Amino acid sequence: MLPLIEKFFKALGSEGVIYCHWKSTASLAAAAQGEDDLDLLISHESRQAFLGVLHRLGFKEAWMSKRASQIPGILDYYGYDETACKLIHVHAHYKLILGQDMTKNYHVPIENVYLESSFQGEFFRIPAPEFEFSVFVIRMMLKHSTWNAILGGQGRLSGRERQEMEYLHKRVSLERIGQVLTNHLPFLNSALFDDCVRSLQPRCPFRVRVKAGEQIQKALQGCRLQPKGIDIWLQFWRRLAMAGKRRLFRNFRRENTKTMKNGGMLVAIVGGDGAGKTTVIEGIVEWLSPFFVTMKVHMGKPTWSWMTILIRGILKVGRSLGFYPFTRGSMDFRDEENPGSFPGYPSLIREVCTGRDRYLSYVKARKQADKGAFVICDRFPLPRMIFMDGPQIERMAGTFPNNWFIRLLGRLESRYYRFISLPDLLCVLKVDPDTAVERKSDETAAFVRARTKEIWENNWEGSTVHVIDANRSKMEVLDRTKALLWAHL
């Protein structure tokens, strides 16, 4: 069992929280290792104590980015186990809400007796097999044996669901099943329940499955949260919307639609060449994106706006016609001792475009973070940075006469950077310049040293600034960054 999960359940016990792991008891070993969700049914009287335990152990609440998809009585909390470098998902249920995955339209009000039947298992408290099996059959019928589920290609149990059914079926007593149905699920008689169990078998005739599906929906009509017609329409519409997103967005996954309830975070990862920024950023995105809305923004090389494309196109035509030579002035690391030559007005104009694009990227990133998403920025404009990602025109102009046009371009560029506020969390990867030169062999030593030295020699202070020793291994740096990010949510 992972350390965080062990602490969590010990705390639940010491606080007297009434709970049980209400489903999927066939795979509790995976849940104890953080591989599966912790699906917990919580007594209403234990709600405050339960929330207190989550808060003390650093769990954060998330919800569906589209509020209409949020199911009442079901909440999601995530914690970070630093030892295993895993996110732990606690799926907290205060009500037994069942149904097709798209809508969950049925409430079976047997929470109290379900919890009363629970006992301590190998890992967690689990319900009596007869209660779990009864609810499992209802869940599978609503999920796989309705007309719309069958027509949507979801009319059969998955391999994992079939294993779970076999696991539970071996542990139940038919006599006790009958008692559960009679005493707690009176709308579901034994004959209908037997038909439902038979309809879930692999070779059950189609007509038997459909008939049983219609009968159980009729038996559960008093448990519906919405009318049947609305439920079917919502399932159809959401399935259609998901299919469209999969076509439009190649990497679309349904799971990554959650955002943080208390707001997301704008995180900037900065560092010189060879500091391992790319490894850290890719690792963070890979870690968060299966669970949450996650966005990666390259502030060093921002996406070109239509204005930038137009202006750069005009400048390219001018260069092709021989109005001015090609220059790369922005890449020269000049200072007062080495002012260098004036790169030409086109280079200054391009810097204004870059400043504007960085500002637009920042605005987009900030909006997403405010909506609860995680936004990971590769580099970031900072006041103390000269060579990387800040205003460049004054430095590039050097000793060239400071005429009105240069001053105008400089003011335009500076204005965009003034509107860019600091990120919620700034992670500075500091690596020794000599080490950076060794790591970044595909660039010139002078180029790498100048950019890395600026990070290395700066005095980084501030409540949102955290310096990370990037001389360590890549995995150590990544793990440290993950821990900082989660702690600052």
Give the location of each predicted region:
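A glycine- and Lys/Arg-enriched "phosphate-lid" helix/loop adjacent to the NTP-binding pocket
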Residues: R379-E457
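Conserved NTP-donor binding/palm subdomain of two-metal-ion nucleotidyltransferases/polymerases, i.e.
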Residues: M1-D36, I42-M265
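Short beta-strand-centered segment that lines the nucleotide-binding/catalytic pocket of NTP-utilizing
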Residues: P290-M307
